[in-house]
Amino acid sequence: MNNFSIISEYKPAGDQPKAIDEIIAGLSSKKRSQMLLGITGSGKTFTMANIIERTNRPTLIMAHNKTLAAQIYSEMKSLFPKNAVEYFVSYYDYYQPEAYIARTDTFIEKDSSINEQIDLMRHAATRSLLERRDVIVVSSVSCIYGLGSPDLYYQMMVNLEPGQSYPRDQLLNDLINLQYERNDIGFERGCFRVKGDNIDIFPSHYSDKAWRLSFFGNELEYIHEFDPLTGEKLAKLDKAMVFGNSHFVMPQETVNNAISGIEEELQKRLEFLKSQDKPLETQRLNQRTQYDLEMLTETGSCKGVENYSRFFTGRNAGEPPPTLFEYLPEDALLFVDESHVSVPQIRAMYNGDRARKKVLVEHGFRLPSALDNRPLKFEEWDKFRPQTVFVSATPGPFELEETGGTVVELIIRPTGLLDPECIIKPATNQVEDLISEMQTTIAQGFRVLVTTLTQKMAEDLTAYLQELKYKTSYLHSNVHTLERIEILRDLRQGTIDVLVGINLLREGLDIPECGLVAILDADKEGFLRSEVSLIQTIGRAARNSAGRVILYADKMTKSIDKAVSETLRRRQIQQEYNEKHGITPKTINRAIHALAEFEKIDSKLDKKQAHTLFDNAAKLKTHIDKLKKEMLKAASNLEFEQAVKLRDQLKTLEEAALELS
C-alpha cells in the first residue's frame, strides 16, 4: 500500500505546524467536526496536505464551485505526484433538466452536453477509491448527487490476469454489459476492438492509454498498455481491472427485477390518476413509461434511466440515493473548503431539485420514484459525512455550532505578510477619489481590484475608466471559466491594470500583484456588504506587502466595524509575530513562474511559419497529432491556459495542413 508523500521544497511554517498538530490531535481523539480558520495566504491547502500526509487516510475535499475545485486539485496534484489525486465535478458542459411549466402547458425535454474529459476523471476517481487507499478526491457539490451503486459497480468489474482462461465470447459479452461499444474502426474511450487473437480495450478512465489483451486460444497470455494513437507499447501489466463505462451499469438480473418494480409502480400510479379523473396525465405516463420499459428490456438502459435508480439499487421510497460518499472507506477524511459558502449550498440543493420533479410527477411525465433520484438532504449529508474539517476565513453558524465555537486559527502567514491596511473614505465622491488612488497604485507597478454593488454600475465604471485610457476589464458571471482565467492572467501580466467586478472578487481570487482593493458603497448593508463578504474581499489585498483596502462609506455599519476590527486584530498578531522572529513581509510571487511556462507555447504561429517549419503534409499531420495529445493532457490536468494556447495553435496548423494537402 502506498503512503501519502508530499513532494515540496517548503516545510510548514508560521501558524501551520501548530494548526496541523491541533487538527491531528482532534482527529485522533475522534472529534467528528473541527474548524480550521485560515486567512487568505496562510497556506490552507498546504496545511490540509500535511494533515492528509500525517494521517494517511483517503480524503474527500469539497469546494463550492468548479473553479475552486480545479485550483485545489492542481495544487494537490503538484504536492502529491506519487499518489492518486482525482477530480469529481458535474460532467455537463451544458445541462437543461426536463421540466414542465403548467401555466403555459410547456414541457421542456432534458438537453445536455457531456464533457468527455470530466466524465473520464469521474471514472478515474471512483476507480481509485475502489482500488487503493492513497486517494484524494477534490469535488464540487456534485458528490451529493445520485451515482450508481458502488456494490453493483464493483460487482460488474472484469478482472483480467495473464495465465487465466477467459472464453472469448463471454469476455466480449461482459464488455458489452459494461456498456463498452465494439468499434473496429474508430477506437476511442469506452470502446473495444477485436483483431485476430488480440482484444484492445480503451478504458473509461484513460484518454491516452489503452490495453491490448493477447490470447492463445482462451488463455490470456499478455496484457500490454499502449498508445492508441501511435500503437507504441508503453508497459506490460500484471493485471487489469475493467470497470463500467457508466456508473449505472448493472447485471441483467438487477435490470429484470427493476422492470418488475417499475411495472408495479406504473399500475398503481395509473389507477391513482384515473381516480383523480386525469385522462391526459394517465395516457402520457403510460406511453412514456412503457417506452422506457421496452428500451430497458432490449438494451438494459434507456434515456433518463437515472429516474428509475431506486429500483436498480433496491432502495425503498424516500431512502437516500447512493452517492460518492458510499465509495469512501469508513476511515475517510472530509475537508469542506470555504465552508461558509459550501454548507449553505449543500443545504439548498434538495429543495430546488424536488420542486421541479414534483411538477413532472403531478402531470404524468414521471413516476413518483423519480423523486428519489436526487441530491442528499442536508440531514443525510450530515449523517453520512466522515470526520470533517471545515475550512474558512469566515466560519458560518453551522460550523461554529458543530465545533462548539472552537476554532484552529491560521493567522500567521509563512511569508510574513500582514492583513492589509483598511482605510475608510466618504462615498460621496468615490469614483473621483478611486481614480486618484488608482494612479498612485498603477505608478507603483501594482494592479487594482474594484468591487461594485450592481452589474450596471460595474459596466458603466468599466466603460468610464476605459474612456480615460485605463487598461480596465470587467469580470462578470457570464464569463466562461477559460475566459475568466485569461482575464486574470492578463491582469497578472499587466495587460490589464484594473479589474471591476461584483461578487466575483472574493473566495479563491489570488492576485499577488494587487496593491489596492476598492470597495464602493461599502455602507450599503446586504449580502454583498455583509461582514463575511467584506472580510473575504479585504483578503484579496493580503498577498502583497504593499496591499491596501479602501472602503467607501458615508456611515459606519456593523458589518464594516466588525470586518475592519477583525482585520486589525489579525494584523496586530501578525506584526507582533514578525517583530519577535525578525521576519520581513515578502510579496508572494510563486504563481508568476507558472505563467512563464504557458508563454513557451506560441499561440500566434501563423500559416506562413507553419509552411516553413513543415515542408510536407505528413510531417505537419504528425505534429498536429502530437499537439492534440498535449492539449488533451493539459485539459485533463486542468491547465486551462496551456490548453487554450494549444487549441489556438492547432487551429492555425490545421488550416495550414489543408493548404499543403
From Swiss-Prot:
Pfam family, one: ResIII
SUPFAM superfamilies xref list: C-terminal UvrC-binding domain of UvrB (SSF46600), P-loop containing nucleoside triphosphate hydrolases (SSF52540)
UniProt-annotated location(s): Cytoplasm
Residues that coordinate or bind ATP: G38, I39, T40, G41, S42, G43, K44, T45
Domain Helicase ATP-binding residues, every copy: 25-182
A single BP term in Gene Ontology: SOS response
UniProt entry keywords in alphabetical sequence: ATP-binding, Cytoplasm, DNA damage, DNA excision, DNA repair, Excision nuclease, Helicase, Hydrolase, Nucleotide-binding, SOS response
Domain UVR: 621-656
The keyword Nucleotide-binding appears for this protein: yes
Keyword RNA-binding: no
Domain comment in the entry: The beta-hairpin motif is involved in DNA binding.
UniProt xrefs under PANTHER family: UVRABC SYSTEM PROTEIN B
UniProt similarity note: Belongs to the UvrB family.
Cited NCBIfam families: PRK05298.1, uvrb
Record-linked HAMAP family: UvrB (MF_00204)
Name the UniProt record assigns to this protein: UvrABC system protein B
Originating species: Rickettsia africae (strain ESF-5)
Gene (name only): uvrB
